[in-house]
Amino acid sequence: RIIIATFASNVDRVQQIINSAYKYGRKVIIEGRSMVNIITTASELGYINIPDNTLIDISQMKNYPDEKVVLITTGSQGENMAALSRIAASIHNKVAIKPGDVVIFSSHPIPGNEKAVFKVINELEAKGAHVIFEDTHVSGHACREELKLIYALTKPKYAIPVHGEYRHLKRH
């Protein structure tokens, strides 16, 4: 099985995972409360396209061979009650790690979360999973040139930075 932990809010990343799973004939399971809520809403609003017969309920996962399943889950930051943390700690009621499972973290730990993330990684590897967590992160934030392009296209009267470190906000 392939298990991918990502931010529920990164709908584009989830779409990429679904597209790849579909291309290779894998069924997709969405797990984690926020992941289910956001992807359901994104699908209803047309922000994400899930091909017919690709998405299955987690209860159906046991009906498919491991090599035909991709589980997209919350928990990329080691959050205690996120689905991946519960899976790693063997307290998830529907998923248990099997030797040979591939678990991909699609983001770097946010500063301050490293200890929790590495705890989850260690628990997964101790259960026989192959964990991929380096060189998988692609920022969801626009770079300087992308911001310039957005401003050029939209020509806003005002631009107010609202997220980031003070030194970055000041330069913006």
State where each predicted segment sits.
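Acidic/His-rich, metal-assisted hydrolase cores and their charged scaffolds
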Residues: 1-172
